[in-house]
């Protein structure tokens, strides 16, 4: 049995009552998931203390062992959810071998969650170039300096690599490295979840058999 001081206690009736959404209006009033997601993300941007666009990205390695990490959503539209990374990182290699992924957004301030599952495809070079150019110069230099996910001798070694790349580019442009780009998760399913008292949560599930099909909408038991 784990230390009961480490794990939060199970809420009692009074505690559950305090978690009730003050806005009792129906929040699943969209029949298109991307529009509903845009509504929720807009609300989260106003209430989350930081990084409302943070999402857990789950992939799997060649043996099928799952892997998960937090990344930042950088674009979303009817085609899917976009993030950027070093293509030579662990997630880059896993997605190259198995182009499928799952996402999870969890906004504590809203007591809401969105789960996404789907196929993964690379963004275009033009998209990657445009986003890379929008980043801070030091971040662009860092993308050249960091051999992401590979062993690092010391923090000093990283800082030396950053200084070397900064000197190499001088005052000139810092182009996008060939090993740095983005991926788009094209959903086959999305689930929208809202916390409700006594674990009687609201769940709305959107799914489709393929990317060209229309969405089926199903309310799920909690």
From Swiss-Prot:
UniProt GO BP: pyridoxine biosynthetic process
Cofactor names: FMN
Enzyme Commission number(s): 1.4.3.5
Name of one Pfam family that matches: PNP_phzG_C
UniProt binding sites for FMN: 69-74, 84-85, 91, 113, 148-149, 193, 203
Catalysed reaction equations from the record: pyridoxamine 5'-phosphate + O2 + H2O = pyridoxal 5'-phosphate + H2O2 + NH4(+); pyridoxine 5'-phosphate + O2 = pyridoxal 5'-phosphate + H2O2
GO molecular function: FMN binding; pyridoxamine phosphate oxidase activity
Keywords from the named record: Flavoprotein, FMN, Oxidoreductase, Pyridoxine biosynthesis
Cofactor note: Binds 1 FMN per subunit.
Residue numbers binding substrate: 74, 131, 135, 139, 199-201
InterPro entries: Pyridox_Oxase, Pyridox_Oxase_CS, Pyridox_Oxase_N, Pyridoxamine_oxidase_dimer_C, Split_barrel_FMN-bd
Annotated pathway: Cofactor metabolism; pyridoxal 5'-phosphate salvage; pyridoxal 5'-phosphate from pyridoxamine 5'-phosphate: step 1/1; Cofactor metabolism; pyridoxal 5'-phosphate salvage; pyridoxal 5'-phosphate from pyridoxine 5'-phosphate: step 1/1
PROSITE patterns: PYRIDOX_OXIDASE (PS01064)
Class of enzymatic activity (EC top level): oxidoreductase
Family: Belongs to the pyridoxamine 5'-phosphate oxidase family.
Subunit-level organization: Homodimer.
Function recorded in the entry: Catalyzes the oxidation of either pyridoxine 5'-phosphate (PNP) or pyridoxamine 5'-phosphate (PMP) into pyridoxal 5'-phosphate (PLP).
Protein's recorded name: Pyridoxine/pyridoxamine 5'-phosphate oxidase
Organism encoding this protein: Maricaulis maris (strain MCS10)
Gene this chain is encoded by: pdxH
């Amino acid at each position: 049995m784990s230390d009961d001081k480490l794990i939060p206690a199970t809420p009692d009736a009074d505690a559950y009552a305090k978690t009730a959404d003050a806005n009792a209006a129906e929040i699943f009033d969209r029949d298109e998931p991307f529009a509903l997601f845009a509504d929720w993300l807009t609300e989260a941007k106003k209430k989350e203390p930081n990084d409302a666009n943070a999402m857990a990205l789950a992939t799997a390695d060649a043996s099928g062992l799952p892997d998960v990490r937090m990344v930042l959503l950088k674009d979303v539209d009817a085609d899917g959810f976009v993030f950027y990374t070093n293509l030579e990182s662990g997630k880059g290699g896993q997605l190259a071998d198995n182009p499928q992924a799952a996402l999870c957004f969890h906004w504590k301030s809203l007591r809401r969650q969105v789960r996404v599952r789907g196929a993964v495809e690379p963004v275009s070079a033009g998209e990657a170039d445009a986003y890379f150019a929008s980043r801070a110069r030091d971040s662009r230099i860092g993308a050249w300096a960091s051999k992401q996910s590979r062993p690092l001798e010391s923090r000093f070694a990283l800082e030396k690599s950053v200084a070397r790349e900064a000197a190499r580019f001088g005052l000139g442009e810092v182009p996008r490295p060939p090993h740095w780009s983005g991926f788009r998760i094209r959903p086959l399913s999305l689930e929208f979840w809202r916390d409700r008292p006594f674990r009687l949560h609201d769940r709305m599930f959107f799914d489709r058999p393929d990317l060209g099909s229309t969405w089926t909408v199903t309310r799920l038991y909690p």
